Each structure stands twice: as C-alpha cells, then as structure tokens.
Curated annotation (Swiss-Prot):
Belongs to the ClpX chaperone family. This is ATP-dependent Clp protease ATP-binding subunit ClpX. HAMAP family: ClpX. ATP binds at P118, T119, G120, V121, G122, K123, T124, L125. It comes from Natranaerobius thermophilus (strain ATCC BAA-1301 / DSM 18059 / JW/NM-WN-LF).
C-alpha cells in the first residue's frame, strides 16, 4: 500500500511521490493526496483527448450520395438543389478537415451557398436537415431584421450569437456550424443610382455581412443587442462556418428572361416564349450578373459562389410532401389521433384538395400544416370525448365544403356520416 508520508513524516503526492515541500499544493482525498503538477498533467491529457474527439467529428464526412439519400428522406423533389448542396457541404467539411491538418500550403477557399426559390419550397428545411445530418450547430436569421452597425435593428454579429447559443456556448463547436440567412433578397440595393440617403438595411447590411461570410474573428456581445465599449465579447472565427443564404428574389426571373431573350434574336434563332418556361426552369439559368442587376453588390456575390435554384411545388409534389417524408404531416396527425385510440385516414382526394388550397394561398409546403389544422380543428375538439369512435375518415368534402368527417364507431363497425 502506498504511504501518504515519507520517513520524516512529510506528506507526499500519491501519484508522483513528490513531498509537500517540492510542490505548490497538495489536495487531500479519502486516503490519497494529489499535487498541483499532477492535476495540471491530468488536465492536459483530458484536453488532448477532447481535442482528438472534436477532430474525429469530421473524420467520417458523409459522401455526397449519402447526404443526398438522407435529404431524400425528408425533402420531396428539388433533385438538382439537393445534389448541389450535397457536393457543396461535402467539399466544405473536407476543407475544414484539411485546414485542421495543414499538411501543405494550398489554402482552399470557402464556398458559401445561395438558394433561390419561391416561398415554401424547402429552402429552410434543406439547411436544417444538412445541419442535422452532420450533427453541427445550426442557427437561422432573417435578413430583414438586420441593419448596418449604429442604426436601429440587429447587428450582423447577433447571427453568430444564435449559433453560439445553439452550440451551448461551445465556441469551438460553433466555429464548425451552419448559418441560414433567410430573405437575403430583401437586402438588395433599392436602386442602381447612389443616393444621398444611406441604405442602412440594404447595401449597408451586405457590406456588414461580407466580413463574416468570408472569414474573420468577430466580437460577439454575449447578451446580444448593441455593442458598447465597456462590455466583454465572445471571440469567434467564422472561417469554417458555412453560410447558406436563401430568398425568393421576386422579379429576378424577368432579369434572366431579358438576358436570355437577347440571344434569341436573328434569323434561324429558336423562338421560345417566356411563358413556356416555369419559374423554376428560369431560375435555374441564373448567373452572377443577374444577381448584380437585382441589387446584390459584386463583393457579396463573390462570397457566395454556389448558386442553386428550387422549383415551385405543384399539386403532385405537395401531395407527396403530405405523406412521404419520414416526418410527413399526415403521419404526425395520424400519431396524434392514435394517442386518442382513433385511426385517421386521409383519402387521396382530400390530400389533393389540401394541396390545391396551398397553391391558391401561395404558401407552398409551409402553409400545409395551417390548412390541415384549420379543417381538423373541430373534430380534434370532439374526438377525445367520444369513446365509441375508432376511425376518422377525411374526404374531399371535409376540406372543400367544411363537412364533418366520416366516423366509424366500435359498436356498429360501419361508416356513419356525422352531420354538423
């Protein structure tokens, strides 16, 4: 058994054997002593192991095809956008690994991503799902709330605070996260002509975003809000943070059509009406010069080299979104009904009626939940108090004419139509 003191009665460290005179401090435990030097050594060993673990987080980056397949489980359609994002994200985290190893002098520059498409087509969901696949912190910001530093509104650094909070204030983890900035088209320059009035929510925000998009050591106020000289800041390096910007870019289709139209002049040119092409097909032809004409500044466009467009969702796509993904809306409501002991059946014509209503409202997939909730609210109010019902059938009439659903009762085993 290890002795706690030497022949002269002096206390000594149970690990390295140094006496109390040879070290600064001895910490006592039940039948054991440890010196400050051994504590420091233990801390270094633990820190090394933690660093190794954090490096291992990206040692097995999913390949583009694997990322694509996982995205397919959650997102219907948008094949080209999913492919482009899978490659871009794979290359980004390969670059992060390469930077960590620093085996050569070749510096791979970061490729941030721009997603174009109408509202409700899956831009936000794509970014969220990517962060989930890679198990990295994720933060979302709305570009419309941002203003240039010194003006009323949010500073761009507050975006980074959301990411740090998502990483439970682990800055090192946050530095490998993903940030999605929505409605980036709303910070386009209001006019091509310079004005006496400062554009603090347009070009000013683009200028403020440049630094964090490219990579900088940013000072973030830990409580958010505006900076002031006497507060402490969290320092975060944005070099390895992947920024995904999204926007509807209303009107850019006309800019693209004007550019393409000029090439269709002359004898023998193929004449094609702009009306023959859908919005998704037009957006797929976007070039950086179109973004410049729309109002993004050249430096900003240069920081987002990966540009991908998303298609508007038609009736068939919306029906698939209702039933096919792992967390599909219909599956969620079936689970809610199942908890009350009731089977929920949504007929095909009812699903198509929901999809048509979403198209009429111009809300895309984002509006599907509100429509379903609106039409199922009354029956979800009544069912918990109806002990004899085991099945609820939603028909087209329930959606289009606000009729009551068809209920199957335990004691009769046949369909009964409930009148209002």
């Amino acid at each position: 058994m290890f002795k706690l003191n030497d022949e002269k009665g002096r206390l000594k460290c149970s690990f390295c054997g140094k006496t109390q005179e040879q070290v600064k401090k001895l910490v006592a435990g039940p039948g054991v002593y440890i010196c400050d030097e051994c504590i420091e050594l233990c801390n270094e060993i633990i820190e090394e192991e933690l660093n190794d673990d954090s490096d291992m987080g990206f040692s097995e980056i999913p390949k583009p095809q694997e990322i694509y397949e996982i995205l397919n489980d959650y997102i219907i359609g948008q094949e080209e956008a999913k492919k482009a994002l899978s490659v871009a994200v794979y290359n980004h985290y390969k670059r992060v690994n390469n930077e960590a190893k620093k085996k050569d002098d070749v510096e791979i520059q970061k490729s941030n991503i721009l997603l174009l498409g109408p509202t409700g087509v899956g831009k936000t969901l794509l970014a969220q799902t990517l962060a989930k696949i890679l198990n990295v912190p994720f933060a979302m910001a709305d570009a419309t709330s941002l203003t240039e530093a010194g003006y009323v509104g949010e500073d761009v650094e507050n975006i980074l605070l959301k990411l740090i909070q998502s990483a439970d204030y682990d800055v090192e983890k946050a530095e490998k996260g993903i940030v999605y900035i929505d409605e980036i088209d709303k910070v386009a320059r209001k006019t091509d002509n310079p004005s006496i009035t400062r554009d603090v929510s347009g070009e000013g925000v683009q200028q403020a975003l440049l630094r964090i998009l490219e990579g900088t050591k940013a000072s973030v106020p830990p409580q958010g809000g505006r900076k002031h000289p006497h507060q402490e800041f969290i320092q975060i390096d944005t070099t390895n943070i992947l920024f995904i910007c999204g926007g509807a870019f209303d009107g850019i289709d006309k800019i693209i059509q004007n550019r393409i139209g000029k090439k269709g002049l002359g004898f023998g040119a193929e004449v094609q009406s702009a009306k023959d092409e859908g919005i998704g097909e037009i957006l797929s032809k976007v070039l950086p010069q179109d973004l410049l004409k729309f109002g993004l500044i050249p430096e900003f466009v240069g920081r987002i080299p990966v540009i991908s467009s998303l298609d508007a969702l038609d009736e068939d796509a919306l029906v698939r979104i209702l039933v096919e993904p792992k967390n599909a809306l219909v599956k969620q409501y079936q689970k809610l009904f199942e908890i009350d002991g009731v089977e929920l059946e949504m007929q095909e014509d009812a699903l198509r009626a929901i999809a048509r209503e979403a198209i009429e409202r111009n809300t895309g997939a984002r509006g599907l939940r509100a429509i379903v909730e609106e039409h199922l609210n009354d029956i979800m109010y009544d069912l918990p108090s109806m002990d004899d019902v085991n099945k609820c059938i939603i028909t087209e009439e329930v959606i289009e004419k606000d009729e009551r659903p068809m209920l199957v009762k335990d004691n009769q085993g046949e369909k009964k139509h409930e009148s209002a």
